[in-house]
Amino acid sequence: MTQFASPVLHSLLDTDAYKLHMQQAVFHHYYDVQVAAEFRCRGDDLLGIYADAIREQVDAMQHLRLQEDEFQWLSGLPFFKPDYLNWLREFRYNPAQVCVTNDNGKLNIRLTGSWREVIMWEVPLLAVISELVHHYRSPNAGVDQALDALESKLVDFTALTANLDMSRFHLMDFGTRRRFSREVQQAIVKRLQQESWFVGTSNYDLARRLALTPMGTQAHEWFQAHQQINPDLATSQRAALAAWLNEYPDQLGIALTDCITMDAFLRDFGIEFASRYQGLRHDSGDPVAWGEKAIAHYEKLGIDPLTKTLVFSDNLDLPKAVELYRHFASRVQLSFGIGTRLTCDIPQVKPLNIVIKLVECNGKPVAKLSDSPGKTICHDKAFVRALRKAFDLPQVRKAS
């Protein structure tokens, strides 16, 4: 296999916003915490043949650095603090933290090191893998095909929403990690900028260059790490929620609900958290059932759901977003994050179902259970059982 001609990544900011948001919180509160994360391909793709090309791109990432114009732009955002930005200015990717191997056709990747550094690898590394694989598998596809597919979807979307009040419909690009390519994501986002309901992107590089609002708060790893940082497993989710508010008391207040399951989350999400957080994000399980639970929870606490926002981001496309909008629009504020179905939706191209997830914190196991059994990730079945017991969940799902 010929090697990729040039580095896939051109900017340290070519990542999801929540990575920097979490990194700042880790920098301030958990500077010395050590973690391990691992790559998973949820599909049947044998990606091991790309290991050498991926390794080459990993090595090239050490040359990325925060540029002066990027530093100044980040400095103008209200939630970044000078000490963190000055540290980020000196940050460099360390390829020694990444082990990439071809295991009989299966791609294995393991990341180890300080959390404040390892946290940066996930999104750009997944984007690199996705772009490399599509480069070799679909050499004749690209921006033109992606834009043609998008235009067709927008025609259908216009027809689908012709009789709807769309003034409260808000769509975000969440497509960095599984994009067809950097160029395709940029072209898609630039086209969507023409639509009144498009409100921003999770990609900090695109947000800066296209004058868009960067979108994102925290990911599963924030909650997972607290399973070992916090001395009591049963209160670890509450500790994660409290630590986030300590770092961001009045901003970035959308909480992810499915690290343990929605039911376990709501038991921890009492009146103080529910009042202070601006809303919740759905990332697994039945979205309608989840939304109904969220609204009922707010109402039970005496909080008007119309003062809160529900963000839907699990395997969405435009028709699914419209369906959810029809169901919930009169009862709660809504935002929709669409990823793969925007940035890798090209005829004859099969998107990759790939993730990188935390598996250890300070040498001990962590787990993501979620509201979709297939998304459970943990090596240690005994720890999964302990986690389920701590959060009063039935012992039914197996770790994978």
From Swiss-Prot:
Modified-residue entries (Phosphohistidine), positions: H220
Pathway(s): Cofactor biosynthesis; NAD(+) biosynthesis; nicotinate D-ribonucleotide from nicotinate: step 1/1
Alphabetized Gene3D superfamilies for the sequence: nicotinate phosphoribosyltransferase
An example Gene Ontology CC term for this record: cytosol
Catalytic reaction equation(s): nicotinate + 5-phospho-alpha-D-ribose 1-diphosphate + ATP + H2O = nicotinate beta-D-ribonucleotide + ADP + phosphate + diphosphate
Post-translational modification: Transiently phosphorylated on a His residue during the reaction cycle. Phosphorylation strongly increases the affinity for substrates and increases the rate of nicotinate D-ribonucleotide production. Dephosphorylation regenerates the low-affinity form of the enzyme, leading to product release.
NCBIfam families: NAPRTase, PRK05321.1
Protein family per UniProt: Belongs to the NAPRTase family.
Its job: Catalyzes the synthesis of beta-nicotinate D-ribonucleotide from nicotinate and 5-phospho-D-ribose 1-phosphate at the expense of ATP.
Name of the protein described by the UniProt record: Nicotinate phosphoribosyltransferase
Species assigned in the record: Salmonella typhi
Gene: pncB
